[in-house]
Curated annotation (Swiss-Prot):
The keyword Zinc-finger does not apply. Keywords: Amino-acid biosynthesis, Aminotransferase, Branched-chain amino acid biosynthesis, Pyridoxal phosphate, Transferase. Its EC number is 2.6.1.42. SUPFAM superfamilies: D-aminoacid aminotransferase-like PLP-dependent enzymes. GO terms for biological process: carboxylic acid metabolic process; isoleucine biosynthetic process; L-leucine biosynthetic process; L-valine biosynthetic process. Acts on leucine, isoleucine and valine. One of its GO terms (molecular function) is L-isoleucine-2-oxoglutarate transaminase activity. This is Putative branched-chain-amino-acid aminotransferase. NCBIfam families: ilvE_I, PRK06606.1, PRK08320.1. Belongs to the class-IV pyridoxal-phosphate-dependent aminotransferase family.
Length: 288
């Protein structure tokens, strides 16, 4: 496997970052998880736009243009001869000293990893619980910044692991259900698709936005509003979305069974629509 690291492609064993890099020392950096389907990088421009917005919010000046960064992603796939892949694109503050002062850091560290990952969208559902870990409020760490600091989600995932379930759902400081550890939450109630609004403590997921667009194209009413535990427990359908997850039905939440552990009709329709567009809404890797 070849890794892009600061302008060069190196073997996996040679892809090394300094122990003084602030991405390692302090989680001081940003990233994107991206998918490629059959030689098309899905929603690549949108991922790059979000990466640069996150970096700008943290005062990290990325030394590449957006067009150059797109080329980094495409070339990483080409040198590894990949068509279906998961891509991790990371930009850190760079190498500094052991202090927090970002002015002591040099230029940002940039690396891109691509691993084989076939399309998912199976029919298997997952089990989830709500956990005691609360999602950080917007005035503490804005979720619009997709930073390297995922400790909040890691702690939630640990609780899910101990409970023997697949995923953890986090509440905000007011008790509303907002997110999974790395995914957005949707419910269906009486034919209406509902999801938490972006003004709550959620990442404005790219797959989330795609699902909302697909639903509206299908004539499905979409409402963005705060969701309570009661809303989830009484939902007709429940699913999560994310770059790696795609669209995954949730069959059980806190022991309550959803839709007799069957994929709901709206969930099924959205999964089918997503499968149709995932090789159309993106940038081609290879000239064919």
């Amino acid at each position: 496997m070849k890794i892009y690291l600061n302008g060069k492609f190196v073997d996996e064993k040679d892809a090394k970052v300094s122990v003084f890099d602030h991405g390692l020392l302090y989680g001081d950096g940003v990233f994107e998880g991206i998918r490629a389907y059959d030689g098309v990088v899905f929603m690549l421009k949108e991922h790059i736009d979000r990466l640069y917005d996150s970096a700008k919010s943290l005062c990290i000046d990325i030394p590449l243009t957006k067009e150059e960064m797109i080329d980094v992603v495409l070339e990483t796939l080409r040198v590894n001869n990949l068509r279906d892949a998961y891509i991790r694109l990371v930009v850190t503050r760079g190498v500094g000293d052991l202090g927090l002062d970002p002015r002591k850091c040099g230029k940002p560290t940039i690396f891109c990893i691509a691993i084989p990952m076939p399309p998912l969208l199976g029919e298997d559902g997952i089990r989830a619980i709500t956990v005691s870990v609360r999602r950080l409020p917007v005035d503490v760490l804005n979720p619009a910044v997709k930073s390297l600091n995922y400790l909040n989600s890691v702690l939630a995932k640990i609780q899910a692991n101990y409970a023997g379930v697949d995923e953890a759902f986090l509440l905000d400081d007011k008790g509303f259900v907002v997110e999974g550890t790395g995914d957005n939450i949707f419910i269906v109630k009486n034919g209406v698709l509902k999801t938490p609004p972006v003004y709550q403590s959620i990442l404005k997921g790219i797959t989330r936005d795609v699902v909302i667009k697909l639903a509206k194209e299908e004539g499905i009413e979409v409402v963005e509003e705060p969701l309570t535990l009661h809303d989830l427990y009484t939902a007709d359908e429940l699913f999560i979305t994310g770059t790696a997850a795609e669209i995954v039905p949730v069959f059980e939440i806190d022991g309550r069974v959803i839709n007799n552990k069957q994929v709901g009709e709206i969930t099924k329709k959205l999964k089918e629509k997503f499968k149709d567009i995932r090789t159309k809404w993106g940038i081609k890797v290879y000239d064919e």
